[in-house]
Design a protein with these regions (language model features):
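Structured catalytic-domain cores with a bias toward divalent-metal coordination
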Residues: 1-219
Length: 219
């Protein structure tokens, strides 16, 4: 079904020459982002950077569906844009053995793209068409909030939801305190009310909790 609130736009190219698409939920008559940005917040979601980690793709499809059918009510100052599948070439390189510890599916894509690049390590160097396309998409959107969806690679995480959030020190005093003390706490409390228990994502590698775990840097 077609919805006038949903746009499906070709906005880049994978290393294999196939297009990268952006899905935009915009319930407003105005479609010019430069105009909308004046009084609207833009949320940008990246999906499928690692094939075999499909949860974010599925969740985004469900979210867009529920927004378009008005099952979910949103504030009247809000637009969502999402890359549907960032690493489409990796998704086409399918097997059943690259994620030995992960429970299903029976077949999935390979972590690297068509040139075997881990795109999660190419945001700054931009050796791939994918990364250069991402930069163009990001500058086109100029989002207020960015989310990059991942899934654990078969590790036994006990919590439903793990996250890496921006280090508050990197945001500056005012924005950093707002994000850490208000925005993030509100999000986590709202998720907990819905039965989703969350915890920061950490790499253990034999460490013990007594000395703490290092925080990830989001760059």
């Amino acid at each position: 079904k077609n919805f006038n609130t949903i746009q499906y736009l070709k906005k880049g190219e994978d290393d294999n020459g196939k297009p990268i698409y952006v899905v935009v939920y915009n319930p407003f008559p105005e479609k010019d982002l430069n105009q909308l940005r004046k009084d609207k917040a833009i949320l940008f979601v990246n999906n499928g950077i690692h094939p075999g980690e499909p949860d974010g793709i599925d969740a985004t499809m469900m979210l867009m569906r529920d927004l378009a059918t008005k099952k979910i009510k949103t504030p009247q100052n809000f637009i969502i844009a999402a890359i549907s599948a960032y690493n489409s070439s990796g998704m086409l390189n399918r097997d059943s053995f690259a994620r030995a510890n992960q429970n299903g599916p029976e077949e999935y894509g390979f972590r690297g793209n068509a040139r075997n690049y881990d795109l999660n390590r190419d945001f700054i160097k931009a050796d791939t068409k994918n990364a250069r396309s991402f930069q163009e998409i990001y500058q086109w959107l100029k989002p207020d909030v960015f989310i990059d969806n991942h899934v654990s690679n078969g590790a036994d995480y006990q919590y439903t939801f793990t996250y890496i959030s921006t280090n508050k020190e990197r945001l500056g005093n005012v924005l950093g305190n707002y994000f850490n003390d208000e925005m993030q706490r509100t999000l986590l409390k709202n998720m907990e009310k819905k039965g989703v228990i969350s915890v920061p994502y950490v790499n253990i590698h034999g460490d013990v909790p007594d000395g703490g775990f290092p925080a990830f840097v989001d760059s």
